[in-house]
From Swiss-Prot:
Cellular compartments per GO CC: cytosol
UniProt-annotated location(s): Cytoplasm
Cofactor mode of binding and number, as noted: Binds 1 [4Fe-4S] cluster per subunit.
Organism: Geobacillus thermodenitrificans (strain NG80-2)
Binding site for [4Fe-4S] cluster: C109, C229, C319
Listed pathway(s): Cofactor biosynthesis; NAD(+) biosynthesis; quinolinate from iminoaspartate: step 1/1
A GO MF label: 4 iron, 4 sulfur cluster binding
Record-listed E.C. numbers: 2.5.1.72
Cofactor(s) for this UniProt protein: [4Fe-4S] cluster
Protein name according to UniProt: Quinolinate synthase
Primary role: Catalyzes the condensation of iminoaspartate with dihydroxyacetone phosphate to form quinolinate.
Length: 367
């Protein structure tokens, strides 16, 4: 069986849901929500489709959703409208009596897949051999539970785009150097904002198993994993220059998963929560070019018709893995619960969850 066939087998939704029209699907979703009541909790990430996010009991960015999962001790079922690592995080932070479900198991994250724990352990061995015990690992929540466990085991913590500066500052209070993974751009942008020079950063290439950079490696303060977000890689300086030339009154706001060059050229940079709040608080008639996932950009356009909002990249498409959570899969997961069947349960092994929770709790204690 090839990889494509294995991937297709992850989707075992009955055919009947694929042929239902939207009105029927929405009616069925409402019926199950009413039936299960407080036994059901539906968190939704800002990048989710409107057809799904309308049923969310709470929406947020990665930090907000982690906090919600940690505080929720009432719901029996948590149907997570996000991607795999978010559902894993929810399972880690909730009790054994609670069940976490991901409507479509194909909803992964390409960035999280750019680092596996075996690569990370080899990198750590090489880096600690060179730098000794002067390094602390920090991992973006966009990562597997196994890597979070590795970080927790080695005294580190998780970070989100909302609290990255606070967490990097904390890490520097613990050790001289930081090993930041898997998103090199968030790590670089955050460290630079805190005064770390580009010549004080280096990149670890997991395939070459080498440290890469232009500075003196003995003076390196931040070691970045060579990973990135496939969505935010599609924003570039040329797009900003085009906005400056054709729409000079337009402000550019981007997510810190964008490259350093893009963040430096933008007017504002911050998490999804920051972007949402900035647009919400902006003056009527203001003009904005937003560099982040398209579902969120489209939602902001709809919610703020008094402002001129466009995507920084006119050819941008939504995050393909976030888009896996669609209305048919969502309703199938809900109706299965109403019939007493759990589909697509996300379960993190206890020994992994224990150490991963250490990394998450260190972050949440500072949040």
């Amino acid at each position: 069986m090839n990889v494509l066939e294995q991937f297709k087998q992850l989707d075992n939704m009955p055919e009947q849901y694929k042929t239902m029209d939207r009105d029927e699907l929405e009616a069925r979703a409402r019926a199950v929500k009413e039936q299960l009541g407080r036994r059901l909790f539906i968190p939704g990430h800002h990048y989710q489709k409107d057809e799904v996010i309308q049923f969310a009991d709470a929406t947020g960015d990665s930090l907000q959703l982690a906090q919600l999962a940690a505080k929720n001790n009432e719901a029996e079922y948590i149907v997570f409208c996000g991607v795999h690592f978010m559902a894993e995080t929810a399972d880690i932070l909730t009790s054994e009596e609670q069940t976490v479900i991901l409507p479509d198991l194909r909803a992964g994250c390409s960035m999280a897949d750019m680092a596996d724990v075996f690569q990370v352990e080899r990198a750590w061995a090489a880096l600690t051999d060179r730098f000794g015990e002067t390094i602390l690992p920090l991992v973006y929540v966009n990562s597997t539970a196994a890597i979070k466990a590795f970080v927790g085991r080695n005294g580190g913590a998780t970070v989100t785009s909302s609290n990255a500066q606070k967490m990097v500052a904390w890490a520097f209070s613990q050790k001289e150097r930081i090993f930041f993974l898997p998103d090199q751009h968030l790590g670089r942008n955050t460290a630079y904002a805190l005064g770390v020079g580009l010549d004080e950063m280096a990149v670890w290439d997991p395939y070459e198993e080498t440290l890469q950079g232009n500075g003196d490696f003995d003076k390196v303060k931040v070691i970045l994993w060579k990973g990135h977000c496939s969505v935010h890689e599609n924003f570039n300086v040329r797009q900003i220059e085009h906005i400056r030339q054709t729409k000079p009154e337009t402000k550019v706001i981007v997510h810190p998963e964008c490259s350093w060059d893009v963040v430096q050229q933008a007017d504002y940079a911050g998490s999804t929560k920051y972007i949402i709040e900035t647009i919400r608080n902006a003056s009527p008639g203001s003009r904005w070019a937003i560099g982040t996932e398209m579902n969120l950009v489209n939602r902001l356009m709809h919610e703020h018709p008094d402002k001129e909002i466009i995507s920084l990249n006119p050819y941008m498409c939504p995050c393909l893995t976030m888009n896996r959570i669609d209305l048919p899969h969502f309703v199938w997961a809900l109706e299965s619960l109403s019939e007493g069947t759990v589909v697509n349960r996300i379960t993190v092994p206890k020994e992994v969850a224990f150490e991963a929770k250490l990394a998450l709790e260190r972050m949440l204690a500072l949040a």
